[in-house]
Amino acid sequence: MRTATITEFSSSYRSLPGLLHLLQFGDSALPIGGFSFSNGLESAIQQNLVHDKETLREFTLTAMNQAATSDRIALLTAHRAARADDRGALQVIDKAVFERKLNEETRLMTVRMGRKLCELSASIIDDRLNRDWLECIKTAETPGTHPVSLGLAFAALDVDGRDAFGAQQYGVATTILGAALRLMRVSFMDTQKILLEATSTVAPAYEEIADAGIEDMASFAPMVDILAAVHVKGHVRMFMN
């Protein structure tokens, strides 16, 4: 039986805290309000665009692709700016994210979750930049979007950009699939099968945008904006978007 060397144990222990931080801040149960949002699924079901496991699969993969080319680019650029302590760049990124949210509900979602996350980070992480960023949000110097707050938190915790990207793409999928279990007739087996396929798209998606700048951030999803507009006027709503 092979015995692990001291070097291997040391390497494992060095990486373990980062892994645990990733799990904590990538958890859908993190108390920042993510469970209140369905990423557009509720309206998609009400409009019969999603009605079975196959249309749910298509919706989930589309949402992940949209997130990869928009909020995830913001996450990575904010992560790099935070590591460089470039506060001017952080404000530019934050405003760019907010301006690209075309409807009321997605704007509400990103700033509400962003502020809650920054309040949490500033309270439990010993990092001056996170505390200063919270003050900027409170004084309305910056919108305080979720991707930027997350980039700051992961930078302070020394989680690398690739892992941060992966955690958040996983979060998009689990948010949608968790909402699906409450909104439509679909089994846990079905959602887990979709999740397994969805996670296989994360690494290729990262490679495509790893070096992207904020000017590359874009998404073309007119149906999502239409569904959000419909949802605002909905009379029966389980989720906030």
Swiss-Prot record:
Coiled-coil positions: none
Primary localization class, coarse: cytoplasm
Superkingdom of origin: Bacteria
Aminoacyl-tRNA synthetase keyword on record: no
Disulfide bonds: none
InterPro entries: UreF, UreF_sf
Cited PANTHER family: UREASE ACCESSORY PROTEIN F (PTHR33620:SF1)
Family according to the record: Belongs to the UreF family.
Function: Required for maturation of urease via the functional incorporation of the urease nickel metallocenter.
Name of this protein: Urease accessory protein UreF 1
Organism lineage: Bacteria, Pseudomonadati, Pseudomonadota, Alphaproteobacteria, Hyphomicrobiales
